[in-house]
């Protein structure tokens, strides 16, 4: 996808001349926390480019695991660091004293929302407690949360429910535990420690992007499902509810979110604000399902379940590890295990619920005019997964 988004008007450049001069005089240095995630990987690819605003950026990328092969071609300084470990953060991050912008795009999952709040709050606080005092030129912190900001947890759903759509940034918080609220509160408190330090919060919906490591990689998960159906000669049936099949959905392209980050980090009109992020169009899964089937040469099924019946990929795919191992061997794919690339819980969460659409008006009003065609976006990330040999290149002959 084209990265000329700023110059070509995907974001309306409204910096005054003095801001532009300051940007040219000082190199932008990024710390991407969660660099192997969907958005982190896009940032790592985009920031070092010479035509990226503020670019080429110097980039540090932090992730818990050793650097994967599919991330090695990005010209960044990779640091393996578990940000939930306070001692490890305090040992590895202080030398990064030239950082000017932090892009925080990672999270962890626990068995309850109370534990999610504690674990994710600690991770963010570890990073900010270490970086803010040690980075004299730190200017801005971008925090990625998500659309679940507007939705109660499963446990609290019957009591607190969700806001009516379209979801807008000025809606009040729900009376429920939500680790996104915890993270925002920590961010707003931490930035007070340094005069002039600004922040932005980014709330994407379902992300279409590339990361075999992501816990929320919907495109990759559906590609793995399609490849297994192809291998077994099965029909590609839609594992979701009728509302998702027939109703309108939206998504957020990982590259678009990265552009949104960079815009907010550099444009004064975006400082100290929370923003939704989505492609700006809508689609129906019954249309994208045909695209997925064509890409893997498999017979396209549809919504074929009796009322009240639920078929979930967590159940259907639980014994398919040996099938995936065979697909990997026969197609010369990257050596992955099914549990690494198939995030069935997440696809079940998305496809067994009707999409709750958001509004991008606030971003537009503040100067960000970026958008994506969601069908083209879906195809783009499928092709990238094939190119990096994460999934087979099967198509209809």
From Swiss-Prot:
Q: Which InterPro entries match?
A: NAD(P)-bd_dom_sf (IPR036291), PRISE-like_Rossmann-fold (IPR055222)
State one Pfam family annotation.
PRISE
Q: Recorded E.C. number(s)?
A: 1.3.1.122
UniProt-listed CDD domains: 5beta-POR_like_SDR_a
Q: Where does NADP(+) bind?
A: 36-38, 64-65, 82-83, 106-107, 144, 180, 207, 214-216
What reactions does this protein catalyze?
Answer: (S)-8-oxocitronellyl enol + NADP(+) = (6E)-8-oxogeranial + NADPH + H(+); (S)-8-oxocitronellyl enol + NAD(+) = (6E)-8-oxogeranial + NADH + H(+)
* Keyword NAD assigned: yes
**Superkingdom of the organism of origin:** Eukaryota
State the UniProt keywords alphabetically: NAD, NADP, Oxidoreductase
Q: Where is the active site?
A: 180
Q: Which GO terms describe its molecular function?
A: oxidoreductase activity, acting on the CH-CH group of donors
Function, as annotated: Iridoid synthase that catalyzes the first step in generation of the iridoid ring scaffold using the linear monoterpene (6E)-8-oxogeranial as substrate. Iridoids comprise a large family of distinctive bicyclic monoterpenes that possess a wide range of pharmacological activities, including anticancer, anti-inflammatory, antifungal and antibacterial activities. Catalyzes the conversion of the linear monoterpene (6E)-8-oxogeranial to (S)-8-oxocitronellyl enol, a precursor of nepetalactones, which are metabolites that are both insect-repellent and have euphoric effect in cats.
Q: Tell me its family.
A: Belongs to the short-chain dehydrogenases/reductases (SDR) family.
- Name assigned to this protein: (S)-8-oxocitronellyl enol synthase ISY2
UniProt organism field: Nepeta cataria (Catnip)
Q: What gene does this protein come from?
A: ISY2
